[in-house]
Amino acid sequence: MTGLLQKDFYNLRTAIKNLLLILVIFIAYLIFRKHEFILPLVPVLLSSSLLTTVINLDRHSKWNMLMITAPLQKSELVKEKYVLLMLLNVSGVLIGTIVSIPFIISGTMKLVSFIDMTVLGWSVALLQGTIFLTYTYLFDKNLLEKLEIMMLVSYVISFAIIISVYYLVPDIFGTKNHSLIITHIVIWAIILLTYFIFWKISVNKNMKSEQM
């Protein structure tokens, strides 16, 4: 799996440079507009979009066909993509944290706001990536021809689910004075569990297809 991760990060080197440039421009704009509280959200949200680049590169390089002759199982490739998603998300969180530290120290950004936006962004990115990988490895392979559309749809679904759950929390607990941080941490924990469940399902499905 280490070799597969190295391959993907090597293939992503140009895309990562371009993404970092976009981030710098985006961050500069947010600072100029005095919207520093959004800084933790942006890097982690963009991190999952790199999955499209990776899978596109695999498809165009005929990597899936090369795997037939390589000493690798398809299930290993699937497992590696889920690990890659988590690594990309963690990298996005770290970048958001590094960028936010000066504003937290100066008092421009509240620590509570930083934690809240970080957890919210990670929840959306992780759910989006999980939905995207589930589409890719569990359903019609013709969907691989529409990766960009799948990526956009998975973002929309992620935001719709998380925002809906957030607004349902006051009704469920009978209060409108619930904690945003606690709400987002609970949502993140549920999404993390969903991520591992679909990881297992995707790997098992591909293991069964290899045995047939």
What is the predicted function of each stretch?
Residues M1-K62, E80-M212:
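Hydrophobic alpha-helical transmembrane segments of membrane proteins
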Residues E76-V78:
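Alpha-helix N-cap/helix-start motif at helix boundaries, enriched for small hydrophobics
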Residues I68-K74:
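Short helix-to-coil transition segments within interhelical loops
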Residues W63-M67:
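Short extracytoplasmic
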